[in-house]
Structures are given as structure tokens and as C-alpha cells.
């Protein structure tokens, strides 16, 4: 049985002692006097912890022992594609010629960097069937917002001011309606049919002269391929709308079929999902947006272009109807480097194999778990890259909820899947193993879920009170939401006031 390390580790600020030094800055070659305007000068000293290098190493090593990441084991968060992040990516991205260039350098001195961005765009165009890409967006949701703003700009440019609605399936990512709303659109929800795919009759009834576009993930968040996608495209295009592809689940069709060939006009991708760059604190992310030829003039500026005659790459601001910038400078460059490294190493055949193994793994897990007491597999049996089970029967029969199952999985040293999503599946367990996971890891995951089922029906309290073997047990979610303590300054002030006692 798994046992996670548990350290009573203080914050690094609490380890601070005056005079302790972990790093000494080199002395300047000569005295440099800089006149800093008074309004820019700090009024109080900068509060940085004073700790030695050994203390820093021990502190973060202990914290890492209370953590779990993709290098620890299976991390099957559905619709997140938590695949292995190859270490060669980091090695290339940390090369001095990558790490120490500056975005304000003259173009002539960063031709290699611009070439990397240009080459990455060519790969993404080939993979998706799009004609032009911006690499600016910093994340998937940032990419979504960019794509929706392009839809808006396109319709306004044509004088179609009545197009105020974005259609979104009921199985969509939560960021889809959020992005559409932020762009000023009314969101119209399209229900799923009994197969878990878009209900064509409902879509036909929803489209109108007010339709700006439809946002769709394919495969969808149930892991099911929208096999009527060509008909969906016809319905949307017939009324003058655009079809937007949320690339969150591209890993399930990589190298097999292209969004552009399905009828999509706009695509956003997640380099931190499909193309192996790290998520979250290991990131940042990147959410490139690709468009068909007729939309390229609306992309954010600048684009990266190539002057063949002079063999020169350059930042291209000649984008007549651009929506402007969606991020400062030119995107998260180090992430772009990591993604291109992955693409070059994998090659076309390797990328095709990625989707084949990802789909095989998801279906193997689904088949092995299907029929286990308390878990139900709604909709179609055959899935792509992920599978969504419902633990509603278990909840009704034992009182054990999906949340309890997820917490109990941690006791086995396994990361929980995405839970309670998509919303159309009650007590959802959304499992995406990715291609990085071995058969042995899949078997262990299924056995843990089966063991939890057995416990739920024989000793439900052990599941309801889980986890038992982790550094942190159940946190107070309500308190965290009502009284967030997210900085050292907030923590210190609240503690001085006696409002927190930890």
C-alpha cells in the first residue's frame, strides 16, 4: 500500500533568518549610477526569504515528496492529456541560445528563433489542415477567446451585426461558453443524443441568421468521435456560421484525420496537452490558433513570415484586419521550442502511433472496468482517447460518491481522474490514460477501481473517509473559497489578526 511522505514543512519565508545567504551577486565591473525616479522606488524593503542554498534544496525536496506529477505515475485527468514530458525538450529549451535571447533584439540577431516559430507553424498547419497560425495565445482558454474574437471580427467586417449567438454542445468544455460570453456572444446550448454526440435535429432548430458559429470538440468530452461531423459542418455553414475546433482532444485523432478536412474553419491547440509540453506550474502553456485562408487577415499581430528571396524570417505586422495582440510579445517561446522538439523527434509516423496507442489504452481500460459493480458506461462503448464512467449506481446503493472514489484512489498511489465532468454524466469519472502509460499501469488502475468498488459495498466508511495515506487529507473547500490565502503577505496579515490559526 502506498504511503506518501508527510513533512511538517513551514513556508520558506518562515525559514528565513537575517544574514543567511544562498546566492551572492557578482560585483559590478565599475560603479554604475542610475537615477531611478522617486515614484518608482520602493518604500519598504523587498521581503525575500534569507536562506542558505542547502536549506532551499532540503525545503523543496521535502515539498516534492508530498507531491504527485506525471513523473510519479499514471495521471489520467480526462480532457487534459497528461502525457510524459520528454526531458530532451527541457534540455533544448534551456540551451543558452534559447534561454538568453531577448524579445526586443533586432530580427537579424534572432533568425534561429524566428525559424523555430515558422517551422512549428508549418507542422501545425500540416497536422490540422489549417492555412495560417498565430502562436501568441498563452493557454487553451486564451486560444479559445482569440478564436471567438476572430469569428466576431469576421462577421462584423461583413456587416453581419445580427450574428450574436455561439452554439455550444452540452458536453463542451466549460471554457467554451465562458470564452464566447467574454467575447460578447449569447451562448446557445445544443443537447446530445442517446449516442453522446450532437443531436442534429436540435442543431437544425438552433441555427439561424443570428448564428455566429459552433464550438465543438472532436472527439468530444465523452471520448466519442462525432461521426456526423460533415453534416454538422453543412448545417452551420448553410446559415453563414463558422465552425470552431477546440483542440483539447486532438490526441485521439493525431495523424489520422484533420480538423480542416472535417469542415472546421478555426482551430485552437494545446501544446501542453497534445505536444508534450508541461502543464501548470511546470509550464506555462501555449494555445496556438489556426485558421483557413479566408480568415488569416484577422489573426493577432505579429505573425512570423519568411522572405524566400532574401532567405530571411521576420515579424509580419501586415495583417490588415487583425484583432490586435492577445498576449504581450510573441507567445511563450520556450514552450514553442519544446513542442517543435517533440514533433521533430516523433515524426509523422510517430504522431500517428501516439493516437493509436492512446485510443488503445482508453478502450483497454474501459473494457476491463466495464461490468464492475457500481460503475456504469453510458452511451457508445467504443471510445477514442478517453472514457467516462458513471458511479451513480454506487452512490445510490452505498452512499459512496465519485468524490470518495477519487480520494480513495490516492491511497493506492494513483492520481484521480477528472470527476463530475462532463456535466451530462452524473457522478462522472473521466479517465484519459494517454499513450505514455503501460499495460501494467492500466491493469493496476483498474484493479484499484475494482477494489474500491468492493470496499464501497462491504465497508463504505473506508472510502468515504479517504484518503488515509497522503500528506494532506480532505481540505476544507468551502473555507478555501470563502477565505483564500494565496500570498505570504495575506497569510502574515491574517495570522497577526488572529483570523487563521495554522
Swiss-Prot record:
Cofactor(s) the record lists: pyridoxal 5'-phosphate
Where do the TM regions start and end? none
N6-(pyridoxal phosphate)lysine PTM positions = 273
Give a GO molecular function annotation for the protein. glycine dehydrogenase (decarboxylating) activity
What does the UniProt keyword field contain? Answer: Oxidoreductase, Pyridoxal phosphate
Q: Could you name the domain of life of the organism this protein comes from?
A: Archaea
What is a single Pfam family found in this protein's UniProt entry? GDC-P
> Tell me, which GO biological process terms does this entry list?
glycine decarboxylation via glycine cleavage system
The enzyme class is: oxidoreductase
What EC number(s) are associated with this protein in UniProt? 1.4.4.2
Q: Does the keyword Oxidoreductase apply?
A: yes
Catalyzed reactions: N(6)-[(R)-lipoyl]-L-lysyl-[glycine-cleavage complex H protein] + glycine + H(+) = N(6)-[(R)-S(8)-aminomethyldihydrolipoyl]-L-lysyl-[glycine-cleavage complex H protein] + CO2
Q: Which GO terms describe its cellular component?
A: cytosol; glycine cleavage complex
Give a short account of what the protein does: The glycine cleavage system catalyzes the degradation of glycine. The P protein binds the alpha-amino group of glycine through its pyridoxal phosphate cofactor; CO(2) is released and the remaining methylamine moiety is then transferred to the lipoamide cofactor of the H protein.
Q: What is stated as this protein's family in its record?
A: Belongs to the GcvP family. C-terminal subunit subfamily.
HAMAP family found in the cross-reference section:
GcvPB
Subunit record text? The glycine cleavage system is composed of four proteins: P, T, L and H. In this organism, the P 'protein' is a heterodimer of two subunits.
Name this polypeptide is given: Probable glycine dehydrogenase (decarboxylating) subunit 2
Record the organism: Pyrococcus horikoshii (strain ATCC 700860 / DSM 12428 / JCM 9974 / NBRC 100139 / OT-3)
